[in-house]
């Protein structure tokens, strides 16, 4: 499921942040800091929009995956976890 996949990816991201894995793009983002991470989130948002404008499902899938990944990096940088996001979404359904 998407939820489990995101949980696993979030754990990998957390590990890369803590271990500062050499050659890791994730570790690089954390080294560069919040501004770099925010820039990447913005870029990926724009790329999802462009993919949708192009009506390309393949492009949307690819860019959405990039956006999910960069959002997870941002969440880790900010100390936010997926459970908190899920709780917010669930609260909105009421």
Q: Where are each of the predicted segments found?
A:
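Flexible "arm" and connector segments at domain edges
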Residues: 1-64, 68-94
């Amino acid at each position: 499921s998407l939820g489990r996949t995101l949980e696993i990816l979030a754990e990998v991201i957390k590990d890369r942040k803590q271990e500062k894995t050499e050659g890791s793009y994730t570790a690089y983002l954390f080294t560069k800091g919040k501004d770099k991470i925010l820039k990447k989130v913005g870029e990926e948002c724009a790329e999802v929009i462009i993919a949708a404008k192009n009506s390309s499902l393949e492009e949307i899938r690819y860019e959405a995956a990039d956006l999910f990944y960069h959002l997870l990096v941002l969440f880790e940088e900010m100390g936010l976890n997926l459970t908190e996001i899920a709780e917010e979404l669930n609260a909105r359904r009421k």
